[in-house]
Amino acid sequence: MFHLGMWRERFLNALVEVSEGRPYSPPPEDIDKFNEAELARGIGTPLTDAGSRSDHLFGEILDVYQQVGHAPFQWYLARTTTEAVLRNSYTHPRMHLHAYLLENGDVEAAHRLFEEAAAEMRAVAAPPIVLGAVLYNLACTRSAQGRLPEAIDLIAESLPMRPDMKDAAASDPGLAPLRDDPRFQELIKT
């Protein structure tokens, strides 16, 4: 939660700068190095405090987004405020929650999280950069469930929205059961 709160704060600050018509501070370039240093500073932060702070910041992000609306805004892969809000405050937390659930043996809840994310993002007609990512994640879930034809269909749907994920798909351990399938091989061909 500390990690999510820090990223929400950083993103909120940039969004506020946009709402005020000022140039915004871009996100850090080396994410892994930055996260490692920041997480070390968060050791000892009570989970309830970090969770409350993260939730509060999410509310503030939504308030500022309502002021700014859909506008050009570059934040990593995101090119608009809408894409950035969804990535920062929807898909990013779900990636961490999914990993946590798997690490703690709650495989069904982890699968359900990605199933619900795909359904929700389809329902709101999420931008391709976001929908493609959640469909890719659902493909990994279907692969883990042994539902390989569905996994391939989801990869086929997601990669046109997220061509940047094609290289990752080729080596993603979550898609390993698909590697020998000719249809999958065709999809990841570069």
PLM region descriptions:
Residues 132, 167-168, 176:
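Start-of-helix signal in alpha-solenoid helical-repeat scaffolds, especially tetratricopeptide repeats
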Residues 31-73:
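Acidic/histidine-rich alpha-helical segments that form the ligand environment
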Residues 1-32, 72-115:
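Short, contiguous alpha-helical
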Residues 137, 171-174:
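"A position-specific structural signal for the A-helix of alpha-solenoid helical repeats
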